[in-house]
C-alpha cells in the first residue's frame, strides 16, 4: 500500500439560522497518516499526538477507525492491516467539527487504501449517514461554505460565497461541551413563528454573503431554533455577545454545538474582537484562546508519501 496523509479542516456549523444544514471549513486541520504496520502480526496500530491526543482512543472504537470499518462494510471488502498516525490541531468537543474530521478522514483514508472505488458524492453520503447531519461533514470534505438541502434520501450541496472581508473570529474556551448535551436542551417542537423567522434569516444570510453586505449579515445571523436554548450552557454568553458587538463585530453566534463562539467581523476590527472575547471570558473566570481563521476552500486533501 502506498503511504499517504489525509488532512481535514475544522468546521463551524449552523452559523446562526442554518441549524443542521449550513457550515463552513476553517484553516485549522487534523491529519492522519496511513501506512502498513511493520509487524506482520499486527492488524491495527493507532498513534495519536497533538492537541488532546491523550484523549484519543487507540483501539478499534476510535471514531476514525470506525469510519474506515464502515467504508469497508459498505463496499464489501476486507479491512487491510493499517497503521494510523493521527496528528491533531483541532480541540475536541468544542464545536469545531472534530468528529467530522475523524469521519471524513477515515472514509477518505479507506477509499484511498482501497484504490478509490467511491466518488466524492458517495463518500459524502456515507459521512452524513455516520454523523447524522451534514453541516460539519460537508464543508470538511468539500471546503468553503456549504448549504445542505435534503432531496429524498440524499443531500444536495450548494456552495455559498463567503467574502474574504468577512473574517471568522473563533473564541475557544478551555471546557468541553458534548453535542449530545447541547441537543438535549432543544425543544422537540417549535412555534410556526420560529420556523418563519429562521427561514427568512437564512435566506438573508445567503444574500449577505453573496453581496458582501455587512449590514444584512448583522441581522441575518439571528436565530430562534437553537441558540436561545444553548446560551445557558455557555457561561457569560450575554456579556460575550455584548462585548463582541461593542468591539465592532457584525454579530456573534455559537459555533456548532458550542462552547466555541464565532464572531464575524471586518479585517480591521477582527484582531481586537479576538482579544476582547478572551478578556471577557477571563473576567468570568474562564480561560480561552481566540483565532482569526481563514475560510478553507480546498476541503479534505490527500498527500501521497511514497
UniProtKB/Swiss-Prot annotation:
Gene3D superfamilies, alphabetized: 3.30.230.10, GHMP kinase, C-terminal domain (3.30.70.890)
Subcellular location: Cytoplasm
Record's GO cellular component terms: cytoplasm
Pathway: Amino-acid biosynthesis; L-threonine biosynthesis; L-threonine from L-aspartate: step 4/5
EC number: 2.7.1.39
Enzyme class: transferase
Pfam families, alphabetized: GHMP_kinases_C, GHMP_kinases_N
Principal localisation: cytoplasm
A Gene Ontology molecular function term of the record: homoserine kinase activity
InterPro entries in alphabetical order: GHMP_kinase_C_dom (IPR013750), GHMP_kinase_C_sf (IPR036554), GHMP_kinase_N_dom (IPR006204), GHMP_knse_ATP-bd_CS (IPR006203), Homoserine_kinase (IPR000870), Ribosomal_Su5_D2-typ_SF (IPR020568), Ribsml_uS5_D2-typ_fold_subgr (IPR014721)
Gene Ontology biological-process entries: threonine biosynthetic process
Binding locations of ATP: 91-101
Keywords carried by this UniProt record: Amino-acid biosynthesis, ATP-binding, Cytoplasm, Kinase, Nucleotide-binding, Threonine biosynthesis, Transferase
Transmembrane segments: none
Top-level taxon of the source organism: Bacteria
Reactions performed catalytically: L-homoserine + ATP = O-phospho-L-homoserine + ADP + H(+)
Task performed by this protein: Catalyzes the ATP-dependent phosphorylation of L-homoserine to L-homoserine phosphate.
Similarity-based family: Belongs to the GHMP kinase family. Homoserine kinase subfamily.
HAMAP family: Homoser_kinase
Name of the featured protein: Homoserine kinase
Species for this entry: Synechocystis sp. (strain ATCC 27184 / PCC 6803 / Kazusa)
Amino acid at each position: 500500500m502506498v503511504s499517504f496523509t489525509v488532512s481535514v479542516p475544522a468546521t463551524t456549523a449552523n452559523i446562526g439560522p442554518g441549524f443542521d444544514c449550513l457550515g463552513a471549513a476553517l484553516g485549522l486541520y487534523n491529519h492522519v497518516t496511513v501506512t502498513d504496520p511493520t509487524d506482520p502480526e499486527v492488524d491495527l496500530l493507532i498513534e495519536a499526538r497533538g492537541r488532546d491526543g491523550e484523549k484519543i482512543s487507540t483501539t478499534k472504537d476510535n471514531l476514525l477507525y470506525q469510519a474506515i470499518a464502515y467504508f469497508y462494510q459498505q463496499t464489501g471488502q476486507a479491512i487491510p492491516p493499517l497503521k494510523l498516525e493521527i496528528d491533531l490541531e483541532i480541540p475536541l468537543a468544542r464545536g469545531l467539527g472534530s468528529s467530522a474530521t475523524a469521519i471524513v478522514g477515515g472514509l477518505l483514508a479507506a477509499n484511498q487504501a482501497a484504490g478509490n472505488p467511491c466518488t466524492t458524492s458517495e463518500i459524502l453520503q456515507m459521512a452524513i449517514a455516520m454523523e447524522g447531519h451534514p453541516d460539519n461533514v460537508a464543508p470538511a470534505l468539500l471546503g468553503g461554505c456549504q448549504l445542505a438541502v435534503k432531496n429524498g434520501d440524499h443531500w444536495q450541496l450548494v456552495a455559498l460565497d463567503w467574502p474574504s472581508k468577512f473574517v471568522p473570529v473563533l473564541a475557544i474556551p478551555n471546557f468541553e461541551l458534548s453535542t449530545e448535551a447541547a441537543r438535549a436542551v432543544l425543544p422537540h417542537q417549535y412555534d410556526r413563528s420560529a420556523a418563519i423567522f429562521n427561514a427568512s434569516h437564512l435566506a438573508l444570510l445567503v444574500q449577505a454573503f453573496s453581496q458582501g453586505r455587512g449590514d444584512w449579515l448583522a441581522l441575518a445571523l439571528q436565530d430562534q431554533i437553537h441558540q436561545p436554548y444553548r446560551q445557558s450552557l455557555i457561561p457569560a454568553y450575554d456579556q460575550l455577545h455584548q462585548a463582541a458587538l461593542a468591539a465592532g463585530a457584525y454579530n456573534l453566534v455559537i459555533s456548532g454545538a458550542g462552547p466555541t463562539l464565532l464572531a464575524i467581523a471586518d479585517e480591521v476590527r477582527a484582531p481586537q474582537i479576538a482579544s476582547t472575547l478572551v478578556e471577557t471570558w477571563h473576567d468570568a473566570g474562564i480561560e480561552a484562546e481566540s483565532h482569526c481563521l481563514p475560510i478553507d476552500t480546498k476541503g479534505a486533501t490527500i498527500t501521497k508519501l511514497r
